[in-house]
């Protein structure tokens, strides 16, 4: 069956601020800020869908059990993403030294709605038949040094510590419950 409003309606807004400052011949700094807001859905007409796939109860319709329906659903994504980056740089004839850090935070909601059904069971318009949230934090600090021993030989070192945290909870579009709470820390040396 043709449905004339099967759409993918998603948009993002991006906001950025960049700042670079040179203090003298040796010192400089940078800061970058970013915010992205994304939201939208795709809409579909589905025929003969099982009530159980949407967490709905069967209906008794004039003595006949009805447990399927034609419906229109929307599957949503609504998220926010924040990033901060900062560095400080010292440079002279023999050494190039950079210190910095980065932090990002993602918060995403994923959910589904039935916006119309031939047989609605106990469902109301805009009820969520699945609903999940995901959070991710990523923090990193680093330092890099390049030391010139002479015109042909340099020493290089890079140290990074990174922490990533994932937290998710809710249920999937298949109505499977999930919960994740993981934290990872890494130390990444390079020479």
PLM feature segments, named:
Residues 2, 177-178:
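Active-site oxyanion-binding pockets that recognize sulfate/phosphate
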Residues 2-8:
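A conserved mid-domain beta-alpha-beta active-site/ligand-binding segment of alpha/beta enzyme cores
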Residues 9-173, 180-186:
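Face-selective signature of the C-terminal outer-membrane beta-barrel domain
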Residues 189-191:
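Short, intrinsically disordered, charge-balanced linker/junction segments flanking boundaries
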């Amino acid at each position: 069956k043709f449905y004339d409003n099967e759409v993918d309606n998603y948009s993002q807004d991006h906001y950025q601020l960049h700042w670079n400052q040179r203090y003298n011949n040796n010192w400089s700094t940078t800061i970058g800020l970013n915010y992205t807001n994304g939201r939208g859905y795709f809409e579909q007409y589905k025929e003969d869908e099982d009530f159980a796939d949407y967490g709905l109860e069967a209906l008794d319709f004039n003595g006949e059990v009805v447990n399927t329906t034609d419906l229109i659903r929307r599957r949503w994504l609504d998220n926010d993403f924040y990033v901060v980056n900062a560095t400080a740089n010292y440079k002279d004839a023999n050494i190039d030294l950079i210190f910095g850090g980065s932090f990002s935070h993602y918060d995403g909601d994923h959910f589904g709605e039935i916006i119309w059904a031939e047989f609605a069971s106990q469902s109301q318009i805009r009820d969520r038949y699945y609903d999940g949230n995901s959070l991710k934090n990523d923090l990193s600090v680093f330092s890099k040094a390049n030391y010139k021993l002479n015109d042909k030989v340099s020493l290089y070192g890079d140290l990074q510590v990174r922490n990533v945290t994932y937290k998710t909870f809710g249920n999937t579009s298949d109505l499977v419950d999930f919960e994740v709470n993981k934290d990872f820390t890494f130390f990444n040396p390079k020479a």
